[in-house]
Amino acid sequence: MKTTYYIPLLMSLLILLTPQSFAMDNIASELPLYSKIYDDERDPFKDAVAAIALAQKTQRNVLIEIGGNWCSWCHKMDAFLAKNPDVYQALHNKYVLLKVSVSDVNENEAFMKSLPPVLGYPHMYVSTNSGKMMLSKDTAELLEGDYYSKNAWLTFLDQWQYDKNAQNLLNMKTE
């Protein structure tokens, strides 16, 4: 009888302790604070300099995510990434994430004026590791219905990664 209780418990533990969950924990523990949270008190200019330096060191692009703790879609996006470890890993393996808070407390006006207009929240920008802006992206484009799409996310992350900068920059010149 005791064996029947141990089998479901063992199966549950095996599911929870997958290599992907370990990888997510390892990635999360190594992320700088500006990649983890929206904070009204952070200086986005200093964080951007640090993000660009890290991107140069690791040959990644910078993904700037504009939002805030008040933003329900920002929370949905974080939940989506937590539930999809392959997307989470692709994001952090290919990009340095810079979360910039905009709120009633701190609109970060000076920083926001340096970027193309925000179309909604969360809003994302991709820059090279030298700071050249390549893309302004409404995250609604990553939705299928009312949910973020795993396929749309993986396609987006693949298309704008560091290894494709030369082609993306060339395409920008011809548009």
Regions found by a protein language model. Name each.
Residues H75-A90:
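Typically the conserved alpha-helix immediately C-terminal to a functionally engaged Cys/Sec
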Residues R42-F45, V87-E107:
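Thiol-based oxidoreductase modules, predominantly thioredoxin-like and allied folds used
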Residues V118-M172:
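Non-catalytic, surface beta->alpha helical segment in thiol-disulfide oxidoreductase systems
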Residues T58-N69:
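Short active-site neighborhood of thiol/selenol oxidoreductases, capturing the structured segment around
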Residues T18-A23:
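Sec/Tat signal peptide C-region and signal peptidase I cleavage site
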Residues M24-T58, F156, Q161-N165, L169:
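N-terminal leader/targeting and pre-domain segments
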Residues P8-L17:
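Bacterial N-terminal signal peptides
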Residues M1-L9:
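Bacterial N-terminal signal peptides that target proteins for export
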